[in-house]
Swiss-Prot record:
Naturally occurring in which organism (per UniProt): Actinobacillus pleuropneumoniae serotype 5b (strain L20)
Subcellular location: Periplasm
Oligomer and partners: The Tol-Pal system is composed of five core proteins: the inner membrane proteins TolA, TolQ and TolR, the periplasmic protein TolB and the outer membrane protein Pal. They form a network linking the inner and outer membranes and the peptidoglycan layer.
Described purpose of this protein according to its UniProt entry: Part of the Tol-Pal system, which plays a role in outer membrane invagination during cell division and is important for maintaining outer membrane integrity.
InterPro entries: 6-blade_b-propeller_TolB-like, PD40, Tol-Pal_TolB, TolB_N
Record's keyword terms, sorted: Cell cycle, Cell division, Periplasm, Signal
Cell inner membrane found in the keyword field: no
Signal peptide: 1-24
HAMAP family in the cross-refs: TolB
Descriptive protein name: Tol-Pal system protein TolB
Length: 426
C-alpha cells in the first residue's frame, strides 16, 4: 500500500498534572496472553491488611513485576508461607522453591488514606536480609499508586533500572462513527478519565517530555489540525493548521518544538513548529511521502516513514533536515526510539519489531494481528501498541525482550493510538 493512501485512509476515519476526576474503574485491564519462562522468580506475599482496603496491594505489585517481563511471581496457591514482615521470613522455605527475593508488607488505614509499608527480602542469607524497605501514606483514591510505588522501588533495587509503573497511557476510544474520546489512564488501564470528547476523529496523541501536555490531531474544525492540550488547565492551542492534512505530532526531547506531517504542497512532508505555535519549518522536500516523525533522545535526529523508494520504510535525518538514510527495511513504519537511544521499535510485516541501532539486528516482539502505533515505556522495558482482534482494535502490551505478552481488552469501542507517558514522578 502506498504511504499516502495509507495516511489518507487513517485521516479519514503523580497525578498533580491531572485535574479531572478519575475513577478506579478502567477502560482496559491487562489479561495475560503469554507468560515468561526465563524471568527471575519472585514472591509477593499478600499484604497484611489492618482493616478494610479497597485494592489488593500485593496482587498489583505482582502484576506490575510480571508485566515488565523481568520477573515471574509465584502463584499465591504455591506460596509456602504468608509472612507479614522480614522477621517472619524463613529463608529455607523460599530457597527450597527457587525463590531468592520475597516482598512482604502491610496496609493500614490512616484517616482518609492508607499507610503502605513493604520490605524486599533476600532469602539467600539466613536469617533473611532486607534489601529495601519503605513506608508512605497515600490518599484512599490513590491506593493503586501506592502499590505502583512499591513496584517501582522493588524493580529498581533488583534490576538497577528505574521502574515505570507510575506512568500513564493516552489512547483514543472510538464508539460508532461519530463518537471519539481521548482518554488517559494508569499504564495498566485503571483510573481512566476523558481528556476530550468529539464527534469528529481524534488521532495520534503524544506526550510532552514533562507529562503536562498532549499533542494530538483533531478534525473538529472540519480539517486535520494539530493541537496541544494542557492537562492542568484544560486549555488547547492549535499549533499546526497548514493547508490540507496535518498529523503525526511528536514533541522534541526538550519540549520546545513539535515535528509533524502535512501535505500542504501535495505530498506529505515533515515540518517542525514551536510547541506554542508559530511558523512551521519544512524539513523534507524529496519525492514521495514523509510522515510519522520521532525524535532521538538527544534531539539531534528525527526518524520518520517515507515511501520515496517505492514502499514505506523508516529513515533517519538530522533534526534540521537534509539528507536521510534508510533504517528499517522495506515495509517498516511507525518507528519510535527507546529512551537510551539504542533500539528502534517499529512495525514491519504488521508486527512489532525491535531493531538494535548498533548492530542492525532485528527481533519480532509481537504475535498479534495487524499491529500498529507502538509506544515505549520511559525505561524501555515495555511496549504498548494497537492490534486487530476480530473486528475490533484493542491495546496490547509486550515486554521489550518479547518474553511477556498481554492484552488490554476494552469494553464497547475501538481502542487506538496508545501513547506511553514520560516519568511523572521524581
Amino acid at each position: 500500500m502506498k504511504l499516502k493512501s495509507r495516511f489518507t485512509s487513517i485521516i479519514g476515519v503523580i497525578t498533580l498534572f491531572f485535574s479531572q476526576t478519575v475513577t478506579a474503574e478502567s477502560d482496559v485491564v491487562i489479561s495475560v496472553d503469554e507468560g515468561v519462562s526465563m524471568a527471575q522468580p519472585i514472591a509477593v506475599v499478600p499484604f497484611k491488611a489492618n482493616g478494610g482496603v479497597p485494592a489488593d496491594v500485593g496482587q498489583i505489585i505482582a502484576d506490575d513485576l510480571r508485566n515488565s517481563g523481568k520477573f515471574t511471581p509465584v502463584e499465591r496457591s504455591k506460596l509456602p508461607a504468608q509472612p507479614g514482615s522480614a522477621a517472619e521470613v524463613n529463608s529455607q522455605q523460599w530457597t527450597d522453591i527457587g525463590v531468592d527475593s520475597v516482598v512482604v508488607g502491610q496496609v493500614t488505614p490512616t484517616g482518609g488514606g492508607y499507610n503502605v509499608a513493604y520490605q524486599l527480602v533476600d532469602t539467600l542469607s539466613n536469617p533473611a536480609t532486607v534489601l529495601a524497605q519503605g513506608a508512605f501514606n497515600v490518599p484512599a483514591a490513590q491506593i493503586r499508586q501506592g502499590a505502583h510505588t512499591v513496584s517501582d522501588q522493588v524493580f529498581e533495587k533488583i534490576t538497577q533500572i528505574r521502574g515505570a509503573f507510575r506512568t500513564k497511557i493516552a489512547y483514543v476510544v472510538q464508539r460508532g462513527v461519530s463518537s471519539y474520546e481521548l482518554r488517559v489512564s494508569d499504564y495498566d488501564g485503571y483510573n481512566a478519565f476523558t481528556v476530550v470528547k468529539s464527534k469528529e476523529p481524534l488521532m495520534s496523541p503524544e506526550w510532552s517530555p514533562d507529562g503536562s501536555r498532549l499533542a494530538y490531531v483533531t478534525f473538529e474544525n472540519k480539517k486535520a489540525q494539530v493541537v496541544v492540550h494542557d492537562l492542568r488547565s484544560g486549555s488547547r492551542r492549535v499549533v499546526a493548521a497548514l493547508r490540507g492534512h496535518n498529523g503525526a505530532p511528536a514533541f522534541s526531547p526538550d519540549g520546545s518544538r513539535i515535528a509533524f506531517a502535512s501535505n500542504q504542497d501535495g505530498e506529505l512532508d515533515i515540518y517542525v513548529v514551536g510547541a506554542n505555535g508559530g511558523k512551521p519549518s519544512k524539513l523534507t522536500a524529496n519525492a514521495g511521502n514523509n510522515t510519522e516523525p520521532s525524535w532521538s533522545p538527544d534531539g539531534s535526529t528525527i526518524y520518520f516513514t517515507s515511501d520515496r523508494a517505492g514502499s514505506p520504510q523508516v529513515y533517519r535525518m538530522g533534526s534540521s533536515g537534509g539528507g536521510a538514510s534508510p533504517m528499517g527495511g522495506s515495509g517498516s513504519y511507525n518507528a519510535k526510539v527507546s529512551s537510551d537511544g539504542k533500539n528502534l521499535i517499529m512495525i514491519a510485516g504488521d508486527k512489532v519489531v525491535k531493531r538494535d541501532l548498533a548492530s542492525g539486528g532485528t527481533e519480532v516482539l509481537s504475535s498479534t494481528f495487524l499491529d500498529e502505533s507502538p509506544s515505549i515505556s520511559p525505561n524501555g522495558i515495555m511496549v504498548i501498541y494497537s492490534s486487530t482482534k476480530g473486528t475490533s482494535k484493542v491495546l496490547q502490551l509486550v515486554s521489550a525482550d518479547g518474553r511477556f505478552k498481554a492484552n488490554l481488552p476494552g469494553a464497547g469501542g475501538q481502542f487506538k493510538f496508545p501513547a506511553w507517558s514520560p516519568y511523572l514522578t521524581k
